[in-house]
Regions:
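N-terminal amphipathic/basic-hydrophobic helices that include classical n-h-c signal peptides
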Residues: 1-7
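Acidic/glycine-enriched connector segments
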Residues: 7-172
Length: 172
């Protein structure tokens, strides 16, 4: 599964960026009306883009909205001929995670159509390299952003600098 780089057509490829659990209104507890409404909004955004001809969906696989995005793409794959490509910042990023997150992460990877690893080992720049790879290899960015500084904002700004189309999905 690793390094089996699937051919992607740029004009049919979307990448995703969003916050990790600590910046989410539901703080990682995926229950309640606020979370369910967010999940519906994100699913609708993905499905609308599928109807516009997007086929390839890149996920950075961070804990939080990336995993939600990935699971929604996998669910929609039952209905549409689409592909989930997981783009990891380095090998085995789940080694430091708790059991249930590790299991969820590995389940997504096992069901993904492809897995790309952008750096062999962890470094301070691993996540930035991964995010730039995703933006460089996509036509559009879907962003779930709550006005916090960090990787999500950096990815949005990088996509803007390249003139990429950006679609925002509200966290609230």
């Amino acid at each position: 599964m690793y390094y089996n780089i699937l051919y992607m057509e740029l004009e049919k490829t979307i990448c995703f960026t969003g916050h990790r659990n600590s910046h989410l209104p539901w703080r990682g507890y995926e229950i309640g009306e606020q979370f369910n409404n967010f999940r519906i909004r994100l699913r609708n955004a993905i499905e609308e883009n599928i109807k516009k001809g997007y086929v390839y969906f890149l996920s950075g696989m961070a804990i939080g909205t990336d995993m939600i995005f990935s699971e929604l793409v996998l669910d929609l794959r039952k209905k549409y001929d689409i592909k989930l490509i997981c783009v990891l910042p380095f090998k085995n990023p789940d080694n430091i995670w708790a059991g249930h997150l590790k299991e969820r992460f590995r389940n997504i990877l096992e069901n993904a159509d492809d897995v790309i690893i952008t750096s062999e080992t962890y470094s301070k720049s691993s996540f930035m390299i991964r995010n730039k790879y995703m933006v460089n290899n996509s036509n559009k960015l879907i962003a779930c952003f709550g006005n916090f500084p960090g990787g999500t904002l950096n990815t949005i700004n990088y996509a803007k600098s390249l003139g990429k189309e950006i679609e925002f999905v509200s966290l609230y």
